[in-house]
Amino acid sequence: MYYIGVDLGTSSVKLILMEPTGDIVNTVSKTYPISFPKPGWSEQNPTDWYDKTCEGIKELIKDIDKDKVAGISFGGQMHGLVILDENDNVIRPAILWNDGRTTKECDYLNNEIGKDKLTEYTANIAFAGFTAPKLLWVKNNEPDNFKKIAKIMLPKDYIAYRLTGVHCTDVSDASGMLLLDVKKRDWSEEMINICKISRKQLPASYESYEKVGCITKEAAMELGLPDNVCVAAGAGDNAAAAVGTGTVGDGMCNISLGTSGTIFISSSNFSVDNNNALHSFDHADGYYHLMGCMLSAASCNGWWMDNILKDTDYKEAQSHITKDMLGNNHIYFLPYLMGERSPHNDPLARATFTGMTMDSTRTDMTQAVLEGVAFAIRDSFEIARSLGINITETKMCGGGAKSELWCTIMANVLGIKVHLLKSEEGPSMGAAMLAMVAAGEYENVKQAADSIVGICRTIEPEKDIADRYNSRYNTFKDIYPALKGVFEKM
């Protein structure tokens, strides 16, 4: 049998065709436009998502026996607002996760409703990217559109609706709406009232691995598939990626070292960071997770190499950093090129080099960039540990994970094992695995992950290096507070 995983990204949809063994049969990617109608705004047409997903599915399955396709599921960009009228037509373009128009609405929620109340109701506070502030923006600025709303949906769930006719979402994606009581895994009545909506306007919520239905006869005819293809609810992109990397079960962790950085920590217990440095969301495996977000991760090294050194040979630049140099560098780098989310929630934070002398070299500064990102990731780890979560190992993926040196630095800064993966298909692979569970191929998400996800290499910390980094991390922690007031004046 075959399973389709759909990763609905911001610029493209990526699809994967997998067998239950984890073997990848085919992959396809289709792009679609994004519009910026005003500075800070970011929108897309939901019908573009569906059209390109259908194109991709047809191409994905063209060379196989279509009757052997057993399931499909989704991972997708989170937080986007899709609103439908009573005839299920899209009312206006979707407002995306990276849209920044909701400053006033976030101020209202965080200051007038109050961060403590929001945390009580949803386990999170308001950020510009979240869905509830967007909903309030429509209410305040497009009242006619607000009155037309019959259903409030998220991006990937619009695709599921078009394929099944079911208005649904999953708890991992819904966690990022600021409308879900994360602990109870159900809609928050308080937030429903605050946003002046009704429960019937919200989709039915499922666990990520649950079957929401089968594709309709119309969708089956359009795609050339049988109409008994099982559709699973799917997950938000980070939770789907966590499934795809095997980050399921208590205390499991995944670090995604891409342009931005994500620290994803799975836990069987619900916990909230009262300082709001980490998000508390539901996980796709039925557990919970804490998530830290760095706005600049591998992009720090890209900036350093491309903009400053004007050098594209990343491997050569890092080859001069020897093992005995690890933990002995005198330069510190704050990796806040675009401000920072976790743990500071400070858009005014800036990147800095600190500690240069006449003896400092290009290699020292290259090393400092790699170490600065690792120290910033440790900030999120320390918060999770303070909440009683014991992290002993992590998966690592993304472009930065291709650097063996960076992975070695990470293992020693964090003091834990770092596992590198055989496959990095991420959200699409996780989505396909969720479809397998929904179709009965596996009993649960952990069983699927244990059977499919492979580790190609493990890097372990070395005590002497880890001890040196512990000392340096304590100094790193002092730099941002010392400069915060300076950043505010810039």
Regions found by a protein language model. Give the residues of each.
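Active-site core segments that coordinate phosphate-bearing ligands/cofactors
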Residues: I4-G5, T103, N110-I125, P133-V166, ...
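Short, acidic/small-residue loops that bind anionic groups at enzyme active sites
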Residues: R92-C106, L421-K422
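Generic detector of well-ordered alpha-helical packing
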Residues: L8, P20, P46, E86, ...
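N-terminal glycine/serine-rich phosphate-binding loop of ATP-dependent small-molecule kinases
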Residues: M1-R92, E120, K148, A220-M221, ...
